[in-house]
Amino acid sequence: MEVGIDIVSLERIEVLYSRYGVRFLEKILLPEEVALCLQKPQIVASVAGRFAAKEAIVKALGSGFAQGVHWKSFAILNDAAGRPYVKVIDDECLPPSSVVKLSISHDRHSAVAVAIIE
């Protein structure tokens, strides 16, 4: 079992989103994720949560964004109950038998995510 955690400032994401708009989202998120974020009333918090989740996952992997792992290797989506889950796009970044558990939270200032890979 491996664990990763990340925290990101909502202000940091707000600055990037204000400066680059949807181009910023498209750089770090897959189209399905972008669509989900743009539907949320708090777009920046939704983007920040996914950003933190992806960072937490690569920390749990131990590779960071290297060795073929990149922002779009996996998507952070939500099930019918709103719980986050990982949709693996690039099978080489995670072994097929891996189970990834995620927890994402945010307040007015930051978003945090914890990833557990079993």
From Swiss-Prot:
NCBIfam families: acpS (TIGR00516), pantethn_trn (TIGR00556), PRK14663.1 (NF011257). GO terms for cellular component: cytoplasm. Transfers the 4'-phosphopantetheine moiety from coenzyme A to a Ser of acyl-carrier-protein. Its main location: cytoplasm. Pfam families: ACPS (PF01648). It comes from the Bacteria. Keywords: Cytoplasm, Fatty acid biosynthesis, Fatty acid metabolism, Lipid biosynthesis, Lipid metabolism, Magnesium, Metal-binding, Transferase. One of its GO terms (molecular function) is magnesium ion binding. It is found in: Cytoplasm. Coiled coil: none annotated. Its EC number is 2.7.8.7. Belongs to the P-Pant transferase superfamily. AcpS family. Transmembrane segments: none annotated. It is an enzyme of class 2 (transferase). It catalyses: apo-[ACP] + CoA = holo-[ACP] + adenosine 3',5'-bisphosphate + H(+). Mg(2+) binds at D6, E55. Its cofactor is Mg(2+). GO terms for biological process: fatty acid biosynthetic process. It comes from Chlorobium chlorochromatii (strain CaD3). This is Holo-[acyl-carrier-protein] synthase.
